[in-house]
């Protein structure tokens, strides 16, 4: 009973663990769809497109001879149907180019091989080799990267038409029905993807760029507040040190903006193909300017990344020194985040900037910070060591001048002595070079000496190390302030990129608040007047 009971218990535990694992996976799948409902609609549309295309298989009466080729329609749906409309259009275009070009070329080569009779298979094999070599080599060119799928379809269609046509003896039917069912599958994908809950890549690109503004603004504001509150990391997370995904809100904010480059490029390639829809009313909507604007945001995010590095640094400024610049640092951070959020809101609403200058407040705050640094620059350096170093340098300069004067006098005396001795003994000319060498070593003696400081304990060493770290901590505060000023300077490029986008995309002008109030009041008065007329008649 004991071993049997133990085995039953282990079997029951394993079944419970398996059921828990299945439940967790189902829960994760439900959360995946709940976080973005478009994923559910995409899956439904994919199944619908496959079902519609599969109907062709059962239509044996009108297409009795072609039913065996209907699988190409299903394969086209599986391969071409993508998440967004733009991606589907790109895949469909590449498949059409590859199919048409390969089908036409294969029919021409098939006709040539039939005329050659005895060399038919030799010509087919040679042409397949050449097509594979040329297509594979050409798609490696950087300019051909967007058409890589077209090259794959070209090779597949070219080989199938030649090989299967040679076996059946009917090249034209193979090429024709393959092209026909590919058109049916691609058309099904486009109709379902465009007219049934469409998912637009351009809209995703628009939202991604707008969210980058908010992410960088949150990181900037959080970094400034954390620095002024003397927030320190006991141990910097390894994920931050290796630039991986982390839960730190200060880190994840600017990292998401920096890491969005590849996603923006792929969305841009798809958005260019999409027809006008929603607020994007033109075929030549400036999608590239959205990516350019996001690049300007990343340029600012790099500065925020360096500002966050000041918080992660091991050498930190003293809290009392931070409080001396608290008001100015806080204002620059708040005004900079305010500008980012305002531009991000304008991008999201597709509105122009207001009549006022958007950078006035943040630039004024940066100027006040710069003036505060100038007035209290003594807090950013070790004034005692600066004064002591200056006095020491002046004393050394005075001693060096006096020493050079003595050396010159001794040189003149030595020269007179040598000249007189040379007149008495001409063979003693070799001693002159030794005298010059000893004199040169005498002049360089001060430059060759190095202050000998022992780091093996002692109060003097501790005091020296303390002063070094104190000076470095003050420089940390200066670095933080200078990075904030640099961030403000980069905002001008960001505003210029937004104005270029708003001009090309024809953003609408913002509606003044007083106009909205007047319209609301007028509408209210008209409603009251209508109510009075209604009740007066009744």
Swiss-Prot record:
The keyword Transmembrane helix applies. GO terms for biological process: malate transmembrane transport; monoatomic ion transmembrane transport. The chain crosses the membrane at residues 40-60, 70-90, 96-116, 123-143, 153-173, 179-199. Residues 357-410 form a coiled coil. It is found in: Membrane. One of its GO terms (cellular component) is vacuolar membrane. Keywords: Coiled coil, Ion channel, Ion transport, Membrane, Transmembrane, Transmembrane helix, Transport. GO terms for molecular function: malate transmembrane transporter activity. It is a multi-pass membrane protein. Belongs to the aromatic acid exporter (TC 2.A.85) family. Malate transporter. This is Aluminum-activated malate transporter 6. It comes from Arabidopsis thaliana (Mouse-ear cress).
């Amino acid at each position: 009973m004991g071993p049997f009971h133990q085995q039953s218990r282990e079997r029951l535990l394993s079944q419970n663990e398996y059921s828990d694992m299945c439940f967790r996976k189902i829960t994760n799948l439900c959360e995946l769809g709940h976080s973005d409902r478009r994923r559910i609609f995409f899956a439904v549309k994919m199944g619908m497109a496959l079902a519609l295309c599969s109907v062709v298989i059962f239509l044996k009466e009108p297409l009795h001879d072609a039913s065996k080729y209907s699988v190409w329609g299903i394969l086209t749906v599986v391969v071409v149907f993508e998440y967004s409309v733009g991606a589907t259009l790109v895949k469909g275009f590449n498949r059409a180019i590859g199919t048409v070009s390969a089908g036409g070329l294969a029919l021409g080569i098939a006709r040539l091989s039939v005329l050659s009779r005895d060399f038919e298979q030799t010509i087919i094999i040679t042409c397949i080799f050449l097509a594979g070599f040329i297509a594979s080599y050409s798609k490696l060119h950087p300019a051909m990267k967007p058409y890589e799928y077209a090259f794959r379809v070209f090779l597949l269609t070219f080989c199938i038409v030649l090989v299967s046509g040679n076996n059946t003896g009917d090249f034209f039917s193979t090429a024709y029905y393959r092209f026909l069912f590919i058109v049916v599958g691609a058309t099904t994908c486009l109709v379902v993807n465009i007219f049934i809950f469409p998912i637009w890549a351009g809209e995703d690109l628009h939202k991604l760029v707008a969210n980058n503004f908010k992410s960088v603004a949150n990181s900037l504001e959080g970094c400034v507040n954390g620095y002024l509150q003397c927030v320190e990391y006991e141990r910097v997370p390894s994920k931050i040190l290796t630039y991986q995904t982390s839960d730190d809100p200060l880190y994840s904010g600017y990292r998401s903006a920096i890491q969005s480059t590849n996603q923006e490029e792929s969305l841009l390639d798809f958005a260019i193909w999409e027809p006008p829809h929603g607020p994007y009313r033109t075929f030549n909507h400036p999608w590239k300017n959205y990516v350019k604007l996001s690049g300007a945001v990343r340029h600012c995010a790099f500065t925020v990344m360096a500002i966050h590095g000041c918080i992660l640094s091991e050498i930190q400024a003293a809290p009392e020194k931070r409080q001396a610049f608290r008001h100015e640092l806080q204002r620059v951070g708040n005004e900079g985040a305010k500008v980012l959020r305002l531009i991000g809101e304008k991008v999201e609403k597709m509105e122009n900037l207001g009549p006022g200058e958007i950078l006035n407040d943040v630039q004024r705050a940066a100027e006040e910070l710069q003036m505060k640094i100038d007035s209290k620059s003594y807090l950013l350096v070790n004034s005692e060591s600066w004064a002591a170093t200056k006095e020491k340098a002046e004393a050394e300069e005075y001693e060096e001048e006096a020493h050079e004067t003595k050396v010159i006098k001794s040189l003149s005396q030595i020269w007179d002595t040598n000249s007189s001795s040379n007149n008495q003994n001409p063979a003693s000319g070799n001693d002159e070079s030794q005298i010059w060498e000893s004199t040169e070593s005498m002049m360089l003696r001060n430059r060759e000496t190095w202050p000998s400081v022992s780091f093996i304990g002692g109060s003097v060493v501790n005091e020296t190390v303390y002063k070094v770290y104190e000076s470095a901590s003050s420089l940390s505060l200066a670095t933080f302030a200078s990075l904030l000023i640099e961030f403000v300077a980069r905002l001008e490029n960001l505003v210029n990129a937004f104005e270029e986008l708003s001009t090309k995309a024809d953003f609408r002008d913002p509606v003044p608040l007083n106009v909205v109030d007047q319209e609301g009041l007028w509408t209210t008065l008209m409603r009251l007047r209508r109510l009075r007329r209604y009740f007066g008649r009744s």
